[in-house]
C-alpha cells in the first residue's frame, strides 16, 4: 500500500512539474504556432486575391496589347501606303531629273566631242598647211617670192611717217629731251675745235664723271634739283671734278647741270650719250663709222645668241674692271675689232645700270646709226635677201618712216618666208611662221 501511495505521490509530483514547467512553454509554442498558421492563412488569402488581380490585369494587358497591336498594324499600313506614294512621287521626280541631266550630259559630251574633233581637225589642217608651206618655200625662188609679196603689201601701206627720235631720248620725258638736245648742240659746237685726241679725252672724262655720279646718288640728285639759279650746282660740280677732266668736258658738264632734268638718272644717260658722240665723231672723221656700226650690231646679235655671256657682262657682283676685261678677251678672240668699237662697248659695260647687256649693246648700235639721222630697222628673213630686195626694203621703210633707214639683216630658217621688221618698239611681222602660229592660236580651245 505504501508502495502505491509512494507511486501516486511520485506521479502527482511529476504531473505538477509537467503542469508547472512544461505546459506553459508548450502552450506558448502552440499559441505562436497558431498565430503563424493564421498569418500564413491570411497571406495565402492575400496571395490568392493578388493572383486573381494579376490574372485579371494580365487578361486586360493582353487585350490592350492586342488592341494596340491592331492599331499599330493599321497605322503601319497607312504609313506604308503614304511612304509608298511619296516614294513613287520622288522616284518620278528623280527619274525626270536624271532624264534631264542625262540629256544635258549627252549634249555636253556631244559638244566636247565636236570641239575636240574641230580642234584636232584644225591642228591637222595647220600641220598639213605647214607641210605644204615648207615644201613650197623649199624652192629658193618661191621663198624669195614670199619676200616680194610682203614688200608689195608693205609698199601699199599708207606712208604715215613716224616720228623718230634719238634712241636714248625714247625713255625720257619732255624736259629731259629738251635738255639732251641742248647738250648735244653744245657738244657739236665744241667738237668743231677739237682734234681726235681731244675728243677721245673728252669721252674718257665724261665716262669717269658718269661713273662718279652713278656711285654718288645724293650728289646726282642735288645736281638735278630744278632751280632757277644754277650757280650752286655748277660750284659743286667744279669742286668735285676740277683738275680731273679737261676744259671741254668741264664745259659740257657745266651745261648739263644748268639744264632741267625730269629724272636724276637722265643726267647720267645724257653724259654717257655725249661721250659716245665724241667717239663716233672720231670714227666719222677717220672714215670708220660704217665699220663701227656694223661691228656694234654684230656684237649685239652675239650677245642675243649667247645669253650666258650677256649675263656675265651684266653681273654687278663682279667689279666693272673684271667685266670689261672679259669683254676685251672676247673681242680679242674675235680677231680684228675696231678700237673705237672696243672703247664704246667698254664704256657701255662700265655704265650698265640694270639694263641687260644685249639690250645696251643694241641701243649703242642704234645710237651710232641715229647720229647720222638714220633709223635702224632689224629685219629677219628665212634666207639672205638679194641686193634688189635689200634696196627695196630700204626704200620702202625710208618712205614709211620719213628718214633714211639702215637695215640690219638676220636670217632664221624657222621663219619659212616673208619678213619681220622691227623699228624701235614697232614690229611688222609678215613671216609665214607667224601666220601659221596665228592660225593655230585661233583654233577653238
UniProtKB/Swiss-Prot annotation:
The chain crosses the membrane at residues 4-24. It is found in: Cell membrane. SUPFAM superfamilies: F1F0 ATP synthase subunit B, membrane domain, N-terminal domain of the delta subunit of the F1F0-ATP synthase. Coiled coil: none annotated. Residues 169-445 are annotated as: ATP synthase subunit delta. One of its GO terms (molecular function) is proton-transporting ATP synthase activity, rotational mechanism. CDD domains: ATP-synt_Fo_b. Its main location: membrane. Keywords: ATP synthesis, Cell membrane, CF(0), Hydrogen ion transport, Ion transport, Membrane, Multifunctional enzyme, Transmembrane, Transmembrane helix, Transport. Residues 1-168 are annotated as: ATP synthase subunit b. It holds the Pfam family ATP-synt_B. One of its GO terms (cellular component) is proton-transporting ATP synthase complex. InterPro entries: ATP_synth_B-like_membr_sf (IPR028987), ATP_synth_b/b'su_bac/chlpt (IPR002146), ATP_synth_F0_bsu_bac (IPR005864), ATP_synth_OSCP/delta_N_sf (IPR026015), ATPase_OSCP/dsu (IPR000711). It is a single-pass membrane protein. In the N-terminal section; belongs to the ATPase B chain family. In the C-terminal section; belongs to the ATPase delta chain family. F(1)F(0) ATP synthase produces ATP from ADP in the presence of a proton or sodium gradient. F-type ATPases consist of two structural domains, F(1) containing the extramembraneous catalytic core and F(0) containing the membrane proton channel, linked together by a central stalk and a peripheral stalk. During catalysis, ATP synthesis in the catalytic domain of F(1) is coupled via a rotary mechanism of the central stalk subunits to proton translocation. F-type ATPases have 2 components, F(1) - the catalytic core - and F(0) - the membrane proton channel. F(1) has five subunits: alpha(3), beta(3), gamma(1), delta(1), epsilon(1). F(0) has three main subunits: a(1), b(2) and c(10-14). The alpha and beta chains form an alternating ring which encloses part of the gamma chain. F(1) is attached to F(0) by a central stalk formed by the gamma and epsilon chains, while a peripheral stalk is formed by the delta and b chains. This is ATP synthase subunit b-delta.
